[in-house]
Protein backbone atom coordinates (compact mmCIF):
# COMPACT_ATOMS: atom_id res chain seq x y z
CA UNK A 1 0.00 0.00 0.00
CA UNK A 2 1.29 3.47 -0.91
CA UNK A 3 2.48 5.46 2.11
CA UNK A 4 4.56 8.36 0.86
CA UNK A 5 5.88 10.35 -2.05
CA UNK A 6 9.09 12.32 -1.96
CA UNK A 7 9.32 14.86 -4.74
CA UNK A 8 11.87 17.29 -6.10
CA UNK A 9 15.11 15.61 -5.09
CA UNK A 10 16.70 15.77 -1.63
CA UNK A 11 15.48 19.33 -0.97
CA UNK A 12 11.90 18.43 -1.90
CA UNK A 13 9.02 17.48 0.33
CA UNK A 14 7.87 14.20 1.85
CA UNK A 15 4.14 13.88 1.15
CA UNK A 16 1.54 11.35 2.27
CA UNK A 17 -0.49 9.10 -0.02
CA UNK A 18 -3.34 11.60 0.37
CA UNK A 19 -1.27 13.91 -1.84
CA UNK A 20 -1.80 11.73 -4.93
CA UNK A 21 -4.44 14.15 -6.22
CA UNK A 22 -1.99 17.07 -6.32
CA UNK A 23 -1.00 18.11 -9.82
CA UNK A 24 2.68 18.40 -10.67
CA UNK A 25 2.35 22.15 -10.72
CA UNK A 26 4.63 24.66 -8.99
CA UNK A 27 1.82 26.35 -7.04
CA UNK A 28 0.03 23.17 -5.93
CA UNK A 29 3.28 21.55 -4.89
CA UNK A 30 4.30 24.62 -2.87
CA UNK A 31 0.90 24.67 -1.12
CA UNK A 32 1.40 21.00 -0.21
CA UNK A 33 4.82 21.76 1.29
CA UNK A 34 6.89 20.31 -1.54
CA UNK A 35 8.74 21.45 -4.63
CA UNK A 36 9.19 20.07 -8.12
CA UNK A 37 12.94 20.66 -7.92
CA UNK A 38 14.82 18.16 -10.08
CA UNK A 39 11.58 16.36 -10.95
CA UNK A 40 12.58 13.19 -9.14
CA UNK A 41 9.91 11.22 -7.30
CA UNK A 42 10.48 8.52 -4.68
CA UNK A 43 7.51 6.30 -3.87
CA UNK A 44 7.38 4.40 -0.58
CA UNK A 45 5.05 1.72 0.76
CA UNK A 46 4.06 0.94 4.36
CA UNK A 47 7.49 -0.64 4.98
CA UNK A 48 9.24 2.73 4.57
CA UNK A 49 9.80 4.79 7.71
CA UNK A 50 9.30 8.50 7.07
CA UNK A 51 11.85 9.31 9.79
CA UNK A 52 14.49 7.14 8.12
CA UNK A 53 13.81 8.64 4.69
CA UNK A 54 14.04 12.12 6.20
CA UNK A 55 17.36 11.19 7.82
CA UNK A 56 18.76 10.07 4.46
CA UNK A 57 17.59 13.29 2.76
CA UNK A 58 19.06 15.49 5.50
CA UNK A 59 22.35 13.55 5.36
CA UNK A 60 22.59 14.17 1.62
CA UNK A 61 21.78 17.87 2.02
CA UNK A 62 24.35 18.22 4.81
CA UNK A 63 27.02 16.47 2.75
CA UNK A 64 26.31 18.69 -0.26
CA UNK A 65 26.53 21.95 1.69
CA UNK A 66 29.40 23.99 0.25
CA UNK A 67 30.28 25.27 3.72
CA UNK A 68 30.50 28.94 2.75
CA UNK A 69 27.67 30.23 4.90
CA UNK A 70 27.30 29.63 8.60
CA UNK A 71 23.51 28.96 8.70
CA UNK A 72 23.69 26.12 6.19
CA UNK A 73 27.03 24.65 7.25
CA UNK A 74 26.18 24.36 10.93
CA UNK A 75 22.41 24.24 10.51
CA UNK A 76 22.48 21.14 8.31
CA UNK A 77 25.00 19.50 10.65
CA UNK A 78 22.74 20.07 13.66
CA UNK A 79 19.61 19.01 11.77
CA UNK A 80 21.35 15.76 10.83
CA UNK A 81 22.44 15.12 14.43
CA UNK A 82 18.89 15.64 15.69
CA UNK A 83 17.33 13.56 12.91
CA UNK A 84 19.76 10.72 13.62
CA UNK A 85 18.90 10.86 17.34
CA UNK A 86 15.21 10.64 16.52
CA UNK A 87 15.80 7.72 14.11
CA UNK A 88 17.73 5.89 16.87
CA UNK A 89 14.83 6.58 19.29
CA UNK A 90 17.19 8.64 21.46
CA UNK A 91 15.62 12.07 21.07
CA UNK A 92 15.99 14.68 23.76
CA UNK A 93 13.34 17.06 25.10
CA UNK A 94 13.06 20.08 22.83
CA UNK A 95 14.55 18.41 19.73
CA UNK A 96 11.55 19.21 17.50
CA UNK A 97 11.49 22.83 18.66
CA UNK A 98 15.23 23.12 18.07
CA UNK A 99 14.79 21.73 14.55
CA UNK A 100 12.08 24.31 13.85
CA UNK A 101 14.31 27.11 15.12
CA UNK A 102 17.34 26.00 13.10
CA UNK A 103 15.19 25.53 10.00
CA UNK A 104 13.70 29.00 10.34
CA UNK A 105 17.15 30.53 10.68
CA UNK A 106 18.36 28.69 7.59
CA UNK A 107 15.35 29.77 5.53
CA UNK A 108 15.85 33.45 6.34
CA UNK A 109 19.63 33.76 6.42
CA UNK A 110 21.32 31.11 4.26
CA UNK A 111 23.02 32.59 1.21
CA UNK A 112 21.61 30.25 -1.43
CA UNK A 113 18.67 28.01 -2.25
CA UNK A 114 20.40 24.93 -0.85
CA UNK A 115 20.45 26.33 2.67
CA UNK A 116 17.10 28.05 2.33
CA UNK A 117 15.38 24.82 1.24
CA UNK A 118 17.34 22.45 3.50
CA UNK A 119 14.64 22.32 6.17
CA UNK A 120 11.87 21.55 3.66
CA UNK A 121 12.07 17.74 3.82
CA UNK A 122 11.92 17.83 7.62
CA UNK A 123 9.02 20.27 7.75
CA UNK A 124 6.94 18.30 5.26
CA UNK A 125 7.73 14.95 6.93
CA UNK A 126 6.74 16.36 10.33
CA UNK A 127 3.51 17.69 8.82
CA UNK A 128 2.48 14.53 6.98
CA UNK A 129 4.03 11.81 9.17
CA UNK A 130 3.81 13.06 12.72
CA UNK A 131 2.75 9.54 13.79
CA UNK A 132 6.11 8.10 12.66
CA UNK A 133 7.95 10.84 14.54
CA UNK A 134 5.80 10.38 17.67
CA UNK A 135 6.51 6.64 17.67
CA UNK A 136 10.26 7.32 17.62
CA UNK A 137 10.15 10.14 20.16
CA UNK A 138 7.43 9.12 22.63
CA UNK A 139 7.25 5.34 22.26
CA UNK A 140 10.99 4.87 21.51
CA UNK A 141 10.27 2.53 18.60
CA UNK A 142 10.29 2.61 14.81
CA UNK A 143 6.84 1.64 13.53
CA UNK A 144 8.31 -0.15 10.50
CA UNK A 145 11.53 -1.45 12.02
CA UNK A 146 13.33 0.37 9.21
CA UNK A 147 15.54 2.43 11.51
CA UNK A 148 17.05 -0.57 13.30
CA UNK A 149 20.65 -1.48 12.66
CA UNK A 150 23.72 0.50 11.70
CA UNK A 151 23.52 3.01 8.88
CA UNK A 152 26.28 4.73 6.99
CA UNK A 153 25.70 8.46 6.83
CA UNK A 154 28.40 10.74 5.41
CA UNK A 155 29.06 13.55 7.86
CA UNK A 156 31.52 15.75 6.03
CA UNK A 157 30.52 19.10 4.75
CA UNK A 158 32.67 19.98 1.79
CA UNK A 159 35.86 21.72 2.92
CA UNK A 160 35.36 25.38 3.73
CA UNK A 161 36.19 27.51 0.71
CA UNK A 162 39.82 28.41 1.45
CA UNK A 163 40.16 29.92 -2.04
CA UNK A 164 38.28 32.95 -0.76
CA UNK A 165 40.58 33.67 2.19
CA UNK A 166 42.37 36.99 1.60
CA UNK A 167 46.16 36.99 1.60
CA UNK A 168 49.21 35.63 -0.14
CA UNK A 169 48.22 31.97 0.20
CA UNK A 170 45.79 32.33 -2.74
CA UNK A 171 48.64 33.27 -5.09
CA UNK A 172 50.28 29.85 -4.75
Which role does the model predict for each range below?
Residues 1-171:
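Redox cofactor-anchoring modules in respiratory/redox and cofactor-processing assemblies
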Amino acid sequence: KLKLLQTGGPLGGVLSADSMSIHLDFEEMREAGAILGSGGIIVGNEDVCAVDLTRVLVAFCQFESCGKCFPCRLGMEHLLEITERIARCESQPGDLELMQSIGGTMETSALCGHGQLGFGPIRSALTHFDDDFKAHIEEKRCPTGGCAGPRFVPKNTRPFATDFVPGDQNAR
